[in-house]
From Swiss-Prot:
Gene name of the record: asnS
First-level EC class: ligase
Domain of life: Bacteria
Organism: Mycoplasma mycoides subsp. mycoides SC (strain CCUG 32753 / NCTC 10114 / PG1)
Protein name from the UniProt record: Asparagine--tRNA ligase
InterPro entries noted in UniProt: Aa-tRNA-synt_II, aa-tRNA-synth_II, aa-tRNA-synth_II/BPL/LPL, Asn-tRNA-ligase, Asp/Asn-tRNA-synth_IIb, NA-bd_OB-fold, NA-bd_OB_tRNA
Length: 452
């Protein structure tokens, strides 16, 4: 029987025999009675097994992480911390872990645990993080399914750079960079975004989304950057920026509400161990009406803050500034005191595909800023005018021949389209309170780090 089932059905199992296979978390010997803490991975909560010290020599030898089979009875323990326990009749040591098993009961640093990423999910902290990650991924699929979105698998290998930043990993079978003789007959790279392909499918299905790995060869050794991460990228035809904003708000609230309902114990653990006040922060997001501020208004607010004596690391605030985390957090934490959408950014600091506004200075872009981290989501309405799109590609030196298929979507009946990108790891960091992206992805890929 799974330990999860015992917790769910314990009242109906009283004094009944159960058989459990589990992993030893701790094994404490007493004079007459000994205590073994077990978990089999099916539940966050550990199960206490009580056995007589005399006559259970095999059980006494079981080290941390060893596998045991327990046959015993479920008994109530109202006077103790746990509601019930299993009193063992038989304990069989199935497989003994080595004495110097790397994860002993003592506290380990996150830096050390990153070096043993293949084992760290067995700790309570990473068990909670990865349970929440799994639940959040399911919630995303469920949200879009309920809204009748079509899930598409955008390609991992591509010849397009959707961001135009040139920070892509090359995919090649050659050492001489002669791409015409390469596998695809041209230069290929790992995808930095599935958005362009999602736009094409949105013209067929109206509402689509991608959810898959993306790659950036950006040599950034920060707590927020990884070379491989997952992105959620919805795209909706016939939608404008206002529709996009509503979809972002609905999705973020849905995911957080799902975690509150289905992973409350893990959330409480993260609140205790990773970020004090985490639950209050998340409650603020899921219960708030998100605010909307234009980029121009945000610049004026920041200018006034500098005049009033507020210290920013970047205090030269002018139109055209690419807002930093300190500016984003000031807007949503100090001014609006709520999650905030900032809209209509200068076109020079945004991607080529964003719809140009009538002022010819800004584009119909939106970023969602949340208390604690700043930007969580970035999106836009897409440029629907073919001539404007071609002109913008040329202005930012994007090869229009490479993107002919994408640009030509505007020639086949194209009336509005909008979408956004949400970095999944950044979302998991926000929900769990983890402070480093390396701690929310099972096997992190960062500069000079390819351990597994």
């Amino acid at each position: 029987m799974e330990i999860r089932q015992i917790f769910e059905q314990h009242s109906g199992l009283l004094d009944k025999e159960v058989e459990i296979l589990g992993r030893v978390r701790s094994n404490r010997q007493g004079k007459f009675v000994s205590f073994m803490i077990l978990n089999d991975g099916t539940t966050f909560t550990d199960l206490q097994v009580v056995y007589k010290t005399k006559g259970y020599e095999q059980a006494l030898q079981a080290r941390v992480s060893s596998i045991v089979k327990v046959v015993g009875r479920v008994v109530l323990t109202p006077e103790k911390q746990q509601k019930f326990e299993v009193q063992a009749d038989e304990i069989e040591l199935i497989d003994q872990a080595i004495e110097d098993y790397p994860l002993q009961k003592k506290e380990h640093t996150t830096e050390y645990l990153r070096e043993i990423a293949h084992l760290r999910a067995k700790t309570k902290t990473f068990n909670a993080i990865f349970k929440i990650r799994s639940a959040a991924a399911y919630a995303i699929h469920r949200f879009f399914n309920e809204k009748n979105f079509v899930y598409i698998h955008s390609p991992i290998i591509t010849s397009n750079d959707a961001e135009g930043a040139g920070e892509a990993f090359l995919v090649t079978t050659r050492e001489d960079a002669d791409y015409e003789k390469d596998f695809f007959g041209k230069k290929a790279s790992l995808t930095v975004s599935g958005q362009l392909h999602a736009e094409a499918f949105a013209q067929a299905f109206k509402k689509v989304y991608t959810f898959g790995p993306t790659f950036r060869a950006e040599n950034s050794n920060t707590a927020k950057h990884a070379a491989e991460f997952w992105m959620i990228e919805p795209e909706v035809a016939f939608a404008d920026l206002k529709d996009n904003i509503q979809l972002i708000q609905d999705m973020v609230k849905y995911i957080i509400n799902y975690i509150f309902k289905h992973n409350r114990r893990e959330l409480e653990f993260c609140n205790e161990q990773l970020e004090n006040g985490l639950i209050d922060k998340l409650n603020n997001v899921r219960n708030s009406e998100f605010k909307v501020t234009t980029y121009t208004e945000a610049i004026e607010i920041l200018k006034q803050a500098v005049k009033d004596g507020h210290k920013f690391e970047v205090s030269d605030i002018e139109f055209g500034l690419d807002l930093g985390t300190e500016h984003e957090r000031y807007i949503c934490e100090q001014v609006n005191k709520a999650p905030t959408f900032v809209t209509n950014y200068p076109k020079e600091i945004k991607a080529f595909y964003m719809k140009q506004n009538d002022d010819n200075k800004t584009v119909a872009a939106v970023d969602l800023l949340v208390p604690g981290i700043g930007e969580l989501v970035g999106g836009s309405q897409r440029e629907d005018n073919y001539e404007k799109l071609i002109k913008r590609c040329k202005e930012v030196n994007i090869d229009i021949d490479q993107l002919e298929w994408y640009n030509n979507l505007r020639l086949y009946g194209y009336y509005k389209s909008a979408g956004f990108g949400l970095g999944f790891e950044r979302l998991v960091m926000y929900i769990t309170g983890a402070s480093n992206i390396r701690d929310v992805i099972p096997f992190p890929r960062t500069p000079k780090n390819l351990l597994f």
